[in-house]
């Protein structure tokens, strides 16, 4: 696995964890374990949906304050990963039970998991309707990013990537 691919997979891990109501605890051990689980899923989503490599930049820079994610394919990738992780119900809404269990399984306590669920639920309800599920997911992701930055919970991707690369 080359350094760029590893960096992209680590970024995907961080984003999926946060977007799918994962864990705001960005400890290297948690991130490394998640990377092993999500890297393959991202590759599967890219192949299944014929997604372009342009999503790499969005995943690598997602948490950078001021970076604007606007690529529809990124929304499609997030949606696909969320489905693979059973984080959304058949209507495309967050599956609260599965998301809560996922968050707690990866280190979030009850209060943190509930707060993250509330943020995503509020973002689902506050983003404008969109018949394009990928663009709707992208809007929810951007809302979530904004709220996480307000809480100062955004991960420092340079530190996370550095820790994971040291383990590879």
Curated annotation (Swiss-Prot):
Subunit structure: Homodimer.
Listed SUPFAM superfamilies: Insect pheromone/odorant-binding proteins
One Pfam family it belongs to: PBP_GOBP
Name this protein carries in UniProt: Pheromone-binding protein
Keyword Transmembrane in record: no
Tissue: Antenna.
Disulfide-linked positions: 45-80, 76-134, 123-143
């Amino acid at each position: 696995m080359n350094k760029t691919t590893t960096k992209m997979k680590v970024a995907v891990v961080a984003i999926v964890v946060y977007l799918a109501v994962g864990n705001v605890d960005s400890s290297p051990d948690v991130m490394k374990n998640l990377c092993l689980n999500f890297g393959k899923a991202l590759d599967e989503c890219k192949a299944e949906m014929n997604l372009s490599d342009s999503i790499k930049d969005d995943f690598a820079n997602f948490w950078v304050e001021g970076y604007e994610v606007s690529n529809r394919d990124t929304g499609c990738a997030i949606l696909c990963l969320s489905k693979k992780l059973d984080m959304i119900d058949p209507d495309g809404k967050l599956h609260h039970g599965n998301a809560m269990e996922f968050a707690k399984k990866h280190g979030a306590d009850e209060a943190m998991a509930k707060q993250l669920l509330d943020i995503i639920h509020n973002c689902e309800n506050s983003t404008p309707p969109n018949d394009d599920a990928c663009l709707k997911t992208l809007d929810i992701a951007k809302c979530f990013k904004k709220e996480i930055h307000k809480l100062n919970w955004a991960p420092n991707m340079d530190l996370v990537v550095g820790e994971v690369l040291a383990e590879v």
